[in-house]
UniProtKB/Swiss-Prot annotation:
Name of the molecule in the record: Ribonuclease HII
Binding sites annotated in the UniProt record for a divalent metal cation: D67, E68, D186
InterPro entries, per the entry: RNase_HII (IPR022898), RNase_HII/HIII (IPR001352), RNase_HII/HIII_dom (IPR024567), RNaseH-like_sf (IPR012337), RNaseH_sf (IPR036397)
Job description of the protein: Endonuclease that specifically degrades the RNA of RNA-DNA hybrids.
Catalytic activity reported: Endonucleolytic cleavage to 5'-phosphomonoester
Main location per the UniProt record: cytoplasm
Molecular function GO terms recorded: manganese ion binding; RNA binding; RNA-DNA hybrid ribonuclease activity
GO biological process, one term: mismatch repair
Localisation: Cytoplasm
Family (UniProt): Belongs to the RNase HII family.
EC number of this enzyme: 3.1.26.4
Organism: Psychrobacter arcticus (strain DSM 17307 / VKM B-2377 / 273-4)
Domain named RNase H type-2: residues: 61-287
Length: 287
């Protein structure tokens, strides 16, 4: 099986809580902190970087897949993840680059059973060169709307991953200016990155190729990997909420507006984790 060496000594853990954010030059105090977590395999990052600068063609660029989970539910966070797979594993799903790897069953998380997603989740974490998972709480969704919350999550997952990469390449006395990165966002639009902040780390806008991939989670392995991280991490928060509020049946509907969920809201009321800006919740509060 084609797998990477992976030891704990190579791993840098990443944890951030974002309470204030710069959006187009304006600082906004978030209604609730955005939590981000992840890790980087420093040894594999350096190996991929060396391959990156040894090849001048665009196909050698470091590829970051980005996807979200949970835009539609009435309850809980929207989760976003970014993931970097080994370059030999990163490409079109139809090319079967993962055929002989531990991630051979990886495809769009929506096409996989929950059992397979749960199986893939730790494997993606283990074999990814790096990943970041963001949890954007309902209060922030209500503050800036679900689209902007999703775009902000995509932006933060990308920027923090690039920031950590830049710091460690600079620490290893590597020329960061030779790094070329393709960021592949699932969907039909890309978030606006804070290029001013990235430039302070040595990452120029010309070094980043942002691409929007419609149905990218079913087309590209790196986006599919991010999809697994986002989906399973959100499911975990739903199961935790279900333990706290079993009467709502959250483990079954995961916060989506099913009949059972709407009946639970009518019977037991609106939870603090409900998205008050969403029409069904807003109507329940008004009634």
């Amino acid at each position: 099986m084609n797998s990477m060496p992976h030891t704990e000594s190579n791993i840098l853990q990443v944890e951030r809580n974002i309470e204030q954010i710069d959006i187009k030059g304006q600082y906004i105090n978030l209604a609730s902190p955005i939590h981000l977590s992840g890790q980087i395999n420093i040894t594999e990052l350096f190996a991929e970087y060396s391959k990156n600068i040894a090849q001048s063609d665009t196909g050698s660029a470091l590829q970051i897949g980005v996807d979200e989970a949970g835009r539609g539910p009435l309850l809980g966070s929207v989760n976003v993840a970014s993931a970097i797979l080994p370059r030999a594993w990163s490409g079109l799903i139809e090319a079967q680059l993962l055929k002989d790897t531990p991630l051979s069953i990886l495809t769009d998380s929506k096409q996989l059973s929950e059992k397979k997603r749960d199986l893939l989740y730790p494997l993606v974490q283990q074999y990814a060169i790096g990943y970041i998972i963001a949890d954007i709480p309902a209060a922030v969704i209500d503050q800036i709307n679900i689209l902007q919350a999703t775009m902000l999550g995509m932006r933060l997952c990308t920027e923090i991953l690039l920031e950590v990469i830049a710091h460690h390449l600079n620490d290893m006395a590597q020329d960061i200016h030779q790094l070329q990165t393709a960021v592949l966002f699932d969907g039909n639009r890309c978030p606006e990155l804070n290029y001013t902040s990235l430039a302070q780390l040595g990452i120029k806008e010309s070094m980043i190729d942002c691409q929007a991939w419609v149905k990218g989670d079913a087309r590209h392995t790196s986006i599919a990997a991010a999809s697994i991280l986002a989906k399973v991490s959100r499911d975990k928060t739903m199961y935790a909420l279900d333990t706290e509020h079993p009467e709502y049946g959250i483990a079954k509907h995961k916060g989506y507006p099913t009949r059972a969920h709407m009946e639970a809201i009518e019977t037991y009321g609106v939870l603090s984790a409900h998205r008050r800006s969403f029409a069904p919740v807003r109507k329940a509060l008004e009634s």
